[in-house]
Amino acid sequence: MGLIFAKLWSLFCNQEHKVIIVGLDNAGKTTILYQFLMNEVVHTSPTIGSNVEEIVVKNTHFLMWDIGGQESLRSSWNTYYSNTEFIILVVDSIDRERLAITKEELYRMLAHEDLRKAAVLIFANKQDMKGCMTAAEISKYLTLSSIKDHPWHIQSCCALTGEGLCQGLEWMTSRIGVR
């Protein structure tokens, strides 16, 4: 009996949780993915298609899909939505001109049937840059308070230093099993 329980427990504990990392090009998605994985900055080039890595946090396994954010690739984001539990939206906090596009993409995703149960973590990236928008400013502009059907959290961060990233992952792990 104990062996059966142990096997079931190990299956439950090692369950992978699918995460998509999205955002406009040059927001810092790939840098964040590899900060999660290696805790260091790696040289990146624009992602064509996707990168996928498994990240383990406190025995919780996340399968993270970093999806290219160029305009020509955004129409294919929906091919990654199936079975997604978490959306990480990376926002470039200094790119005020394209925040309206980010907002459009966010609400397009939230309306998609395959993401109806997904929780949303918004990383307000590049907080180390002079003149950046605060997480509160981004939250207000994206009207995050109007999102009622999805749990969400906004977190200030700096992908280059890793500041704020652990807090975002902790929020995600706290959401496991909460629906």
Curated annotation (Swiss-Prot):
Keywords: GTP-binding, Lipoprotein, Myristate, Nucleotide-binding. The keyword GTP-binding applies. GO terms for molecular function: GTP binding; GTPase activity. A lipid is attached at G2 (N-myristoyl glycine). One of its GO terms (cellular component) is trans-Golgi network. GTP binds at residues 23-31, 66-70, 125-128, 159. GO terms for biological process: intracellular protein transport; protein localization to Golgi membrane; vesicle-mediated transport. Binds and exchanges GTP and GDP. This is ADP-ribosylation factor-like protein 5B. It comes from Homo sapiens (Human).
